[in-house]
UniProtKB/Swiss-Prot annotation:
Biological classification of the source: Bacteria, Pseudomonadati, Thermodesulfobacteriota, Desulfuromonadia, Geobacterales
Function comment: Catalyzes the decarboxylation of four acetate groups of uroporphyrinogen-III to yield coproporphyrinogen-III.
UniProt-annotated location(s): Cytoplasm
Name of the protein: Uroporphyrinogen decarboxylase
A GO biological-process term: protoporphyrinogen IX biosynthetic process from glutamate
Pathway: Porphyrin-containing compound metabolism; protoporphyrin-IX biosynthesis; coproporphyrinogen-III from 5-aminolevulinate: step 4/4
InterPro entries: UROD/MetE-like_sf, Uroporphyrinogen_deCO2ase_HemE, Uroporphyrinogen_deCOase
Amino acid sequence: MNNRFLDACWGKPVDRTPVWLMRQAGRYLPEYMAVRSRCSFLELCKTPELAAEVTIQPVDILGVDAAILFSDILTPVEPMGLKLDFVPGPVFENPVRTMADVEKLRIPDPEADVPYVLQAIRILRKELAGKVPLIGFGGAPFTLACYMVEGKGSKDWATIKRMMYAAPDVYAALMEKVTMMDMEYLNAQIRAGAQAIQIFDTWGGVLSPTDYEKYVLPYTTKLINGLNRKETPVIHFVKGSGTMLPVVQKAGGDVMGLDWHINLGSARDILGPEMAVQGNLDPTTLYAPHAVIEQEVKRVLNENAGRPGHIFNLGHGILPTVPPENAKFMVDCVHRLSQR
């Protein structure tokens, strides 16, 4: 079993830096597109055998050191009572805007409401046995609430910000409910066999550090503290958090996910030796010639300066039009250049 990823999460020394990619099971792989051509995105998420198949593809094709469950962060939100569709981005036809809307939301039972997610994890633990660890994941409460209130993607998330400022009681009630749902969902993933959990707060960085601390931090902290994580490391990734790492760090967790807007060495200095880090190559680097990819991999590794507790990753998801051979070259570079 390749335990480099889990060892790095706990800050233990490893013989070479582990690497995986956010969205590594995805559209840039022809093998993924072959599966996806037979079903809709939601059908793929809700069919355990297919979700497991595409989860394993990048492990075999790229040689990454961890698999991450193929799913969507909004999967557990639908059974709360919202109608979800992808056209092509996520859209809720009945967004949450009032206290009455919040009161109608239910806390799903993961075993009953999203059994396909847990079944995919169980299949994957069998199929990945002796290979690499499996990462489960979920959206952070704030990012989930962004979609639930806005009803779709947004550039500025003005609707949820307006709720935060103008209807703080509605916002607090919603965040409380989403946090409880998230806790149940992620603990169910751990019970099913997920060996690490990544919490994605894709939109946490749209807030000022002051607003993040007031409106987001209490809920993410509650979520992380509520996970049964004695042997299950938690990676906390807040996109755009480079300017507020000391605040984000207060939420807890074992690994801080970093995007590419901060020097990895500077981030480690801010976070201190107790917290591992994950990141942080700019995803567009994978369009570059191999010599440039190698140079950039070397730069990120040099910024870490050999400190234990580094998982190499992109600073966000791999882009759909990246040549797969460039992703494979990057993984090989990380392994070759970090060999101890």
